[in-house]
């Protein structure tokens, strides 16, 4: 077996989530209001008990409110928010409650199906809890019995959000404030997988009975062309087909179409749930075996085994009149069906680099 791309893992630096940034800036602003204390750094406690210190860009009074900001540091993770200025504005309330507001660059939920209700600011539950716990501790220390209004902002967040799944999920106007551990693990993929689950949830809750999970832009374009599916029904799964298949056990959407490049679909056919080259490889001898099952002679089998890429193997089979693309999709279909509930109808498409369909199996 050989990999089609080479990637060498290296030690990477962790960062802090937007939820941690919002907690730190909210705490600093509230402390300034209650005690008059300001500083250029603030310490917060993460959900698992680790204490981290975060540098502040500013902490100042703004009329009856206070505001504090920090630069988001995602470590070595390719996070669109890395380096963005996140700042919180805090206002004191008479009633003992904490009210969250979506400020500039933070989105608002507009579709049902997410963990937050329609109309709520896109500040997820764990960041809300982190902020609330820190502000309550501060209130106890200061003998304060009122509440807080917390407005979270991300400079340039509305444009940054266009690079995320938020528009497709119905989170409009900016980014989501995220995080479950408070720490960004480089390339941990947790946020990506969460967005896949959210995409399925939103499509299902809004009544869509057919979704297409796609590995990239070309496969999404193919699904638009073949089925005319709207954005809400297109799930950008990347390499994480396992995240789609397993989630359908919880949310059994009636019909699932899987669409991806031939090489990635061949990995799914071999039973891989993660299609990235770090975790799964193209098995050319297996491709040759599947070609043999549908009539490939010994010479073609040898040529497939010796191919440089799966695309070359496919081209060799196609030139010999062997429908390897369909065979691979049939094996991928069988594996996918073994994971999802029986009531979910599944089909699989394989495409070439130009988006042309080179294989298909399942519902027609």
From Swiss-Prot:
EC code: 2.1.1.195
The catalysed reaction is:
Co-precorrin-5B + S-adenosyl-L-methionine = Co-precorrin-6A + S-adenosyl-L-homocysteine
Q: Which GO terms describe its biological process?
A: anaerobic cobalamin biosynthetic process; methylation
Instruction: Name the enzyme's class.
Output: transferase
Q: In which pathway does it act?
A: Cofactor biosynthesis; adenosylcobalamin biosynthesis; cob(II)yrinate a,c-diamide from sirohydrochlorin (anaerobic route): step 6/10
Going by the UniProt record, its keywords in alphabetical order are: Cobalamin biosynthesis, Methyltransferase, S-adenosyl-L-methionine, Transferase
Family matches, as InterPro entries: CbiD, CbiD_sf
In its keyword annotation, does this UniProt entry include Metal-binding? no
- Protein family per UniProt: Belongs to the CbiD family.
- Name of this protein: Cobalt-precorrin-5B C(1)-methyltransferase
Query: What lineage, starting at the top, does this entry show?
Result: Bacteria, Pseudomonadati, Pseudomonadota, Gammaproteobacteria, Pseudomonadales
Instruction: State which gene encodes it.
Output: cbiD
């Amino acid at each position: 077996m050989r990999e089609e791309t080479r990637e060498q893992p290296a030690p990477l630096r962790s960062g802090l989530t937007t939820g941690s940034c919002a907690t730190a800036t909210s705490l600093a602003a509230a402390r300034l209001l209650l005690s008059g204390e300001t500083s250029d750094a603030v310490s917060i406690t993460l959900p698992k008990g680790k204490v981290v210190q975060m540098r502040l860009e500013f902490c100042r009074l703004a009329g009856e409110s206070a505001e504090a900001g920090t630069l988001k540091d995602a470590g070595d993770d390719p996070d669109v928010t890395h380096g963005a200025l996140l700042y919180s504005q805090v206002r004191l309330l008479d009633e003992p409650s904490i009210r969250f507001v979506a400020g500039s660059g933070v989105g608002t939920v507009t579709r049902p199906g997410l963990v937050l209700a329609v109309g709520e600011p896109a500040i997820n539950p764990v960041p809300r809890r982190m902020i609330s716990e820190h502000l309550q501790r501060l209130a106890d220390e200061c003998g304060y019995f009122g509440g807080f209004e917390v407005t979270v902002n991300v400079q340039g967040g509305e444009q940054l959000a266009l690079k995320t799944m938020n528009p497709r999920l119905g989170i409009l106007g900016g980014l989501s404030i995220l995080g479950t551990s408070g720490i960004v693990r480089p390339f941990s993929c947790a946020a990506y997988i969460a967005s896949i689950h959210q995409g399925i949830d939103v499509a299902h809750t809004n009544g869509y009975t057919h979704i297409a999970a796609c590995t990239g832009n070309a496969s999404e374009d193919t699904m638009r062309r073949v089925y005319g599916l709207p954005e809400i029904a297109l799930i950008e799964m990347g390499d994480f087909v396992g995240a789609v298949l397993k989630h359908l056990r919880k949310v059994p959407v009636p019909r699932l179409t899987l669409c991806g490049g031939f090489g990635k679909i061949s990995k799914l056919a071999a039973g891989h749930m993660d299609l990235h080259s770090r975790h799964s490889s193209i098995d050319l001898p297996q491709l040759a075996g599947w070609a043999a099952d549908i009539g490939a002679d010994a010479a073609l089998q040898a040529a497939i085994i010796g191919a440089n890429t799966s695309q070359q193997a496919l081209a060799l089979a196609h030139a010999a009149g062997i429908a390897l693309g369909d065979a691979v999709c049939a094996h991928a279909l069988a594996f996918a069906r073994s994971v999802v509930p029986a009531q979910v109808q599944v089909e699989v498409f394989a495409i070439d680099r130009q988006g042309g369909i080179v294989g298909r199996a399942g519902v027609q």
